[in-house]
C-alpha cells in the first residue's frame, strides 16, 4: 500500500469521503483538500493549502466560534488570541542603596511615588479608620512579642550554667596567657551566642503564636467588621463595562490536570450565568515541544467541550522573559487595557463561579482595593504526606490567615494566585524591573508576588485577604522531596526580595513581610547554629575544667549551675507557644462540629498523626533549608522548574541519596552525645532520631497507598473530601477523561499526523513575509533536522521547527512523500505508541457509524511504513 493511501486512512473522514480522494501522490491529495486552490510554487508547500480542511475535519465543533483567517502570505491561521490593544509598561529601576537614595534626595530627585486620591470623603474616612486601627494593632503585636521575648530571654540567661558574666574583665586578661584567657571566655562566648539565637528564634515563634491566637478569637467570635467580605451586598449586578480576565500562566505543567481544572472552573462560572463578564487566557511559557503540542490539542478540545463563544484563548510565548512575572507583564501590555480586573490562577488552581463573581463584586464595592487575595483550600492529593499537609492547612490555616488579616487589614499578603487584581494600577505601578548588580541575587525577581503587593500598596491601593471567602482551591506537593524542591526556589526568591527592604516609599507592613519571608528560611540555619552551640557548650563542659576564679583577687568561686527544673519549665513554655495554635485549631473544630473531619475521635487522632509527622520532619527541613540558604549565598543557581502535580512516591534510592547525609549526621550526633552525657542525649532525642529516621519517613509518607488507607479509615479527612464541592468533583472527572486521551510524543505527531500537523501549522506564530534569506534559513533547519535521527534533535531545534508554519508543512510533506529518504524519522515514529483515545475529538460526528473504520485501525494506518 502506498503512503498516500495510508495518509487518507489517517484522515477523520467517512469511508465514502475517503473514496473521493485521489491516492496518486501526496501533492495531488493536498491540492484536492485545498478548497481555496492556492497555487504554491514549491511542491513541499502543498500541505499549507489543506490546513483549513484538515482542521475543519478534525475539530469542527471547536471552530464554530473561532476564526480561521489567512496571514499576509495566504497561509491558514487559527486565531488563538484576540486583537491586541497595547499599553505602555515601563518599570522603574530599583534604588536599593540607601547612600544613593540619600544622594538623590540631596539633588531633589525624590523617587517616592505620589498618588492622587480616588475616593470620596466617606470612603477616605473609612480607609483612614482601618489604617489607624491596623497601626494600633501592630504596635500591640510588637509590644506583646518583644515583651514575651525579653522575659523568655532573661529566663534563659538565668538557667545557663556559667553565671560569671559580670566578673569578666578583658583588661585583667591582657597580661595572662592567651590560651588560658580563651578557655576562660569560651563558655561565655558560646552562651552569648546561644542567648542571641534564642532571642531571635523565640521572637519568631512568639509572633506566630499571637497571630494564631488573634485568628482564633476572630473566628470564635465570628464577626469581623473590617473583613473585606463584609462589604458584599448580596448578588448585586456586575457592571458590564468591568470585564475580568482569568489568566493562567503555565510552564511545562501537567496538561491533563491544567485543562481539567480550567474546564471545571469555567463551567462553574457558566452555572452562575455571569460568564459574559469573564474571559480565560492560558499563557504558556512551556519549552518542552511535546508538552507544547499537547497544550494546543487540549485547548482546541476544550473549546468544543464548553461550547466556547470566543472567550477562551491560548498563547505560547516565543521569548521567555522574566518567567511568570514577565508572562503576566506581556498579557497586561497586549490585552490588559481590555479588562478592569484579572484573576491569576496557578496550574493547579480551581475556583468556583461563586468565588470568582464574589471577588469581582468585592472589587466593585471597594474602589480602593488593588488586590484581593482569596484563601486557597488544599485538596486533591492522596499520598500520606500530602494528606497530612492538606489536613494541617485546612485545620490550622484558618487561624493563621484570619490572624494575618487581623494584624495587616488592607496592607496584606498576595500569594501570586487565586487572587483578583485591578489591572490598570497593576500596569502602572507593579511592573518589576531587574534587580541591579551581578550574582544570584540580581536579575529577574523570583518571588514576584510579595513585591507586587508592596508596590500596589505603595501606590495607595489596598491589598486584602478575603480569608472567609469559600470556593478557592489548590494542590500541594505529593511528597517531602518535591516540597523541598519548591522551598529551594522560594528560599532564593525571599532572600532576593530582602534586597528591596530599604526601597523608598514601601509601607512598613510590607517591609515586615519581606523580613518574615526571609525568616521563614533563615530561621533554619539559626536553629541549627543554636543546636550546634548548645552541643559545643556541652563538649566544653565535658572536656575542660571549669574556671572558678575569673579575676586575680576573686574571693568566692563561680560554680557552674545546673537547674533542670527551670530548663524544663522554659522548654514547656516554648512548647506551649509552638503547639497551642494547633490545640486552638482543634478546639475551634470541636466547638463548631467535627462531622466533616471524620468525627471527634478521628479528628483528634488525625491531629496526633500530623503532629508526629511534623515533629519527625522539622529537623529534616531545618537541614535542607540551611543548605538552601548557604547555597544561595554561595551563588549556586536555582532551576525554576514546574513542581510535581500528581501523586508521586519517593524511591528508596532517591531517599537515601537525599537523606543519607542527614542519617549519618544523626548517628554521629547521637553517638557522640551518648558518649559524653546520656542526659544531654535526652534533650536532643527529637532532633537526632528524626534525622536517623528521615529516609524511612520520607519514603513511607510519600506512598499513596498509605494515604488512601488513612482516607478509608476517615483519618486526615477534610471537608472537601467529606462533602466535595461540585467544582472539585468535576475536576477529578475531567482529569480522568483527559488521562484516557492524553497525547504523548506530541512533536512527532505534529510532524506526521495530518490532524496534529494542521493544528500546529495553524497556530504557529513565526509568520514572516517572503524573503530569500528566510527561505535559505528554513531549508537549512529542515535539512539539519531530517539528516539526523529525531531523538537526537535538541529541544531548541524542535521549538524552532514548531514555531514556523512553513517548516512544519514542509517537514510533513517530506516524511510522507519521501519515506525511504527519511527512514530514520519514519522508523522512529513507527516505534511510538499513539493513545487510541487521543484522536477522540478528531472522529467525525455522523449518524451512520457503519461508514467508519475502527479507531485503532485508523491509528495503525497513520503510521508511515505500516504493512
Curated annotation (Swiss-Prot):
Q: A GO molecular-function term, please?
A: hexosyltransferase activity
Q: Where in the cell is it found?
A: Cell inner membrane
Any one Gene Ontology BP term: glucan biosynthetic process
Which residue windows are transmembrane per the record?
A: 139-156, 194-216, 518-540, 568-590, 603-625, 680-702
Q: Which SUPFAM superfamilies match?
A: Nucleotide-diphospho-sugar transferases
Q: Where is this region: Disordered?
A: 71-91
Q: In which pathway does it act?
A: Glycan metabolism; osmoregulated periplasmic glucan (OPG) biosynthesis
- Name the EC number(s): 2.4.1.-
Give the source's domain of life in one word.
Bacteria
InterPro entries, sorted: Glucans_biosynth_gluTrFase_H (IPR023725), Glyco_trans_2-like (IPR001173), Glycosyltr_2/OpgH_subfam (IPR050321), Nucleotide-diphossugar_trans (IPR029044)
Keywords per UniProt:
Cell inner membrane, Cell membrane, Glycosyltransferase, Membrane, Transferase, Transmembrane, Transmembrane helix
A Pfam family the protein falls into: Glycos_transf_2
Q: Which GO cellular component does the record give, naming just one?
A: plasma membrane
Q: How does it sit in the membrane?
A: Multi-pass membrane protein
Note the PANTHER family from the entry.
CELLULOSE SYNTHASE CATALYTIC SUBUNIT A [UDP-FORMING], GLUCANS BIOSYNTHESIS GLUCOSYLTRANSFERASE H
**Purpose:** Involved in the biosynthesis of osmoregulated periplasmic glucans (OPGs).
Spell out the family assignment given in the record's similarity comment.
Answer: Belongs to the glycosyltransferase 2 family. OpgH subfamily.
Query: What is the official name of this protein in its record?
Result: Glucans biosynthesis glucosyltransferase H
Amino acid at each position: 500500500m502506498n503512503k498516500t493511501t495510508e495518509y487518507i486512512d489517517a484522515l477523520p473522514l467517512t469511508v465514502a469521503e475517503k473514496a473521493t480522494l485521489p491516492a496518486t501522490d501526496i501533492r495531488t491529495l493536498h491540492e484536492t483538500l485545498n478548497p481555496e486552490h492556492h497555487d504554491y510554487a514549491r511542491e513541499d508547500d502543498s500541505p499549507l493549502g489543506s490546513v483549513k480542511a484538515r482542521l475543519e475535519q478534525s475539530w469542527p465543533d471547536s471552530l464554530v466560534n473561532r476564526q480561521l483567517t489567512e496571514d499576509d502570505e495566504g497561509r491558514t491561521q487559527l486565531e488563538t488570541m484576540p486583537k491586541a490593544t497595547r499599553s505602555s509598561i515601563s518599570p522603574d529601576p530599583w534604588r536599593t542603596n540607601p547612600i544613593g537614595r540619600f544622594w538623590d534626595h540631596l539633588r531633589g530627585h525624590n523617587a517616592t511615588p505620589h498618588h492622587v486620591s480616588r475616593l470620596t470623603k466617606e470612603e477616605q474616612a473609612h480607609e483612614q479608620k482601618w489604617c489607624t486601627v491596623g497601626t494600633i494593632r501592630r504596635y500591640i503585636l510588637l509590644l506583646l512579642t518583644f515583651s514575651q521575648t525579653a522575659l523568655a530571654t532573661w529566663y534563659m540567661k538565668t538557667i545557663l550554667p556559667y553565671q560569671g558574666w559580670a566578673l569578666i574583665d578583658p583588661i585583667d586578661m591582657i597580661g595572662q596567657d592567651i590560651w588560658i584567657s580563651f578557655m576562660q571566655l569560651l563558655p561565655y562566648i558560646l552562651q552569648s551566642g546561644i542567648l542571641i539565637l534564642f532571642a531571635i528564634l523565640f521572637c519568631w515563634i512568639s509572633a506566630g503564636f499571637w497571630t494564631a491566637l488573634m485568628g482564633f478569637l476572630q473566628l470564635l467570635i465570628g464577626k469581623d467588621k473590617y473583613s473585606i467580605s463584609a462589604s458584599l451586598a448580596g448578588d448585586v449586578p456586575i457592571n458590564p463595562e468591568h470585564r475580568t480576565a482569568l489568566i493562567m500562566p503555565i510552564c511545562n505543567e501537567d496538561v491533563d490536570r491544567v485543562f481539567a481544572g480550567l474546564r471545571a472552573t469555567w463551567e462553574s462560572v457558566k452555572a452562575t450565568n455571569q460568564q459574559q463578564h469573564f474571559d480565560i487566557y492560558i499563557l504558556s511559557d512551556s519549552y518542552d515541544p511535546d508538552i507544547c503540542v499537547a497544550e494546543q490539542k487540549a485547548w482546541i478540545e476544550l473549546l468544543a467541550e464548553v461550547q466556547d463563544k470566543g472567550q477562551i484563548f491560548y498563547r505560547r510565548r516565543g521569548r521567555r522573559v522574566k518567567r511568570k512575572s514577565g508572562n503576566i507583564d506581556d498579557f497586561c501590555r497586549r490585552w490588559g487595557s481590555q479588562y478592569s480586573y484579572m484573576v491569576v490562577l496557578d496550574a493547579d488552581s480551581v475556583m468556583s463561579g461563586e468565588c470568582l463573581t464574589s471577588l469581582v463584586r468585592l472589587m466593585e464595592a471597594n474602589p480602593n482595593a488593588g488586590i484581593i487575595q482569596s484563601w486557597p483550600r488544599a485538596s486533591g492529593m492522596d499520598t500520606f504526606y500530602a494528606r497530612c499537609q492538606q489536613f494541617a492547612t485546612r485545620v490550622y490555616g484558618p487561624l493563621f490567615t484570619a490572624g494575618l488579616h487581623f494584624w495587616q487589614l488592607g496592607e496584606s499578603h498576595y500569594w501570586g494566585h487565586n487572587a483578583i487584581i485591578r489591572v490598570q494600577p497593576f500596569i502602572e505601578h507593579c511592573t518589576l524591573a531587574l534587580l541591579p548588580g551581578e550574582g544570584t541575587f540580581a536579575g529577574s525577581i523570583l518571588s514576584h508576588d510579595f513585591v507586587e503587593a508592596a508596590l500596589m500598596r505603595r501606590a495607595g491601593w489596598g491589598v486584602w485577604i478575603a480569608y472567609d471567602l469559600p470556593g478557592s482551591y489548590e494542590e500541594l506537593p505529593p511528597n517531602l522531596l518535591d516540597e523541598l524542591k519548591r522551598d529551594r526556589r522560594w528560599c532564593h526568591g525571599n532572600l532576593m526580595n530582602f534586597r528591596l527592604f530599604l526601597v523608598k516609599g514601601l509601607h512598613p507592613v510590607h517591609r515586615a513581610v519581606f523580613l518574615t519571608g526571609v525568616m521563614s528560611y533563615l530561621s533554619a540555619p539559626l536553629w541549627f547554629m543554636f543546636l550546634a552551640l548548645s552541643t559545643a557548650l556541652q563538649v566544653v563542659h565535658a572536656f575542660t575544667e571549669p574556671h572558678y576564679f575569673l579575676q586575680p583577687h576573686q574571693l568566692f568561686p563561680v560554680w557552674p549551675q545546673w537547674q533542670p527544673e527551670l530548663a524544663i519549665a522554659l522548654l514547656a513554655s516554648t512548647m506551649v507557644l509552638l503547639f497551642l495554635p494547633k490545640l486552638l485549631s482543634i478546639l475551634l473544630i470541636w466547638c463548631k462540629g467535627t462531622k466533616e473531619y471524620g468525627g471527634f475521635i478521628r479528628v483528634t487522632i488525625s491531629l496526633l498523626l500530623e503532629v508526629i509527622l511534623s515533629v519527625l520532619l522539622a529537623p529534616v527541613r531545618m537541614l535542607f533549608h540551611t543548605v538552601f540558604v548557604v547555597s544561595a549565598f554561595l551563588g549556586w543557581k536555582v532551576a525554576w522548574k514546574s513542581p510535581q502535580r500528581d501523586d508521586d512516591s519517593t524511591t528508596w534510592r532517591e531517599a537515601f541519596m537525599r537523606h543519607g547525609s542527614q542519617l549519618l549526621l544523626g548517628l554521629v550526633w547521637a553517638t557522640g552525645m551518648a558518649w559524653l552525657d546520656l542526659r544531654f542525649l535526652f534533650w536532643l532525642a527529637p532532633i537526632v532520631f528524626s534525622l536517623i529516621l528521615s529516609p524511612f519517613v520520607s519514603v513511607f509518607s510519600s506512598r499513596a497507598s498509605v494515604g488512601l488507607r488513612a482516607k478509608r479509615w476517615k483519618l486526615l479527612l477534610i471537608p472537601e473530601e467529606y462533602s466535595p464541592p461540585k467544582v472539585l468533583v468535576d475536576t477529578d472527572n475531567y482529569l480522568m477523561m483527559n488521562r484516557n486521551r492524553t497525547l504523548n510524543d506530541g512533536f512527532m505527531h505534529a510532524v506526521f499526523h495530518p490532524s496534529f500537523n494542521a493544528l500546529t501549522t495553524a497556530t504557529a506564530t513565526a509568520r514572516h513575509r517572503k524573503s530569500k534569506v528566510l527561505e535559505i534559513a528554513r531549508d537549512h533547519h529542515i535539512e539539519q533536522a531530517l539528516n539526523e535521527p529525531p531523538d537526537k534533535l535538541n529541544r531548541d531545534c524542535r521549538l524552532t521547527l514548531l514555531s514556523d508554519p512553513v517548516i512544519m508543512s514542509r517537514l510533513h510533506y517530506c516524511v510522507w512523500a519521501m519515506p525511504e529518504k527519511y527512514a530514520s524519522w519514519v522508523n522512529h515514529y513507527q516505534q511510538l505508541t499513539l493513545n487510541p483515545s487521543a484522536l477522540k475529538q478528531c472522529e467525525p460526528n455522523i449518524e451512520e457509524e457503519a461508514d467508519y473504520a475502527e479507531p485503532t485501525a485508523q491509528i495503525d494506518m497513520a503510521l508511515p511504513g505500516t504493512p
